[in-house]
Amino acid sequence: FYFSSTKRNGGDRDIYYMDPKNPSAAKMVLQVKGGGWGILDLSKDNSQLLIGEYISANESHIWSLDVASGKLSEVTDRASKGVIQGDAKFGNLTNEIWFLTDKDNEFERLAILDVKTKKVNYLTSKINWNVENFSFSEDKKQLVFITNEAGRNKMYLMNTKDQSYSEVKNIP
């Protein structure tokens, strides 16, 4: 499994791979500078890691690591300052990454990035509150997302094929 740790120097949060049956053989797969790096998702074929770089409460970025080559690539534009881009997950299609962002908006929205075209489709722009997090079903045909609406959390269920969603009512 993959994990992040500051074990190299106590400050920089590098990415490692470890076989749980042989923890002493953990190997670094990405050396970084700074403590705000963390793993977001692993592709279905185990070839790509999505990695988040947390700069501040108002700025974060998403990267992709090719596990075989060790090549780190920008997913979101690192030059975008003051933009939150995080909580990224691979979608069902190999060219899509689902993530949260406040780019060009007051609120964090759920969005899909087409990796090939770099086009972003914002899915929750009609909700004028922050989307706090989201989670796919195991088959990734549905997802739930949580909003914070005036201090109250609301849950929504989305069909990932057509991106339609509705609020889940009467949660105990």
Question: What name fits each language-model region?
Answer:
Residues 8-10, 17-38, 54-57, 63-89, ...:
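Multi-bladed beta-propeller domains
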Residues 1, 40-48, 87-96, 134-142:
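Blade-terminus and WD-like Trp-Asp/Gly-His loop motifs, strongest in beta-propeller folds
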Residues 110:
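Cationic-aromatic interfacial patches
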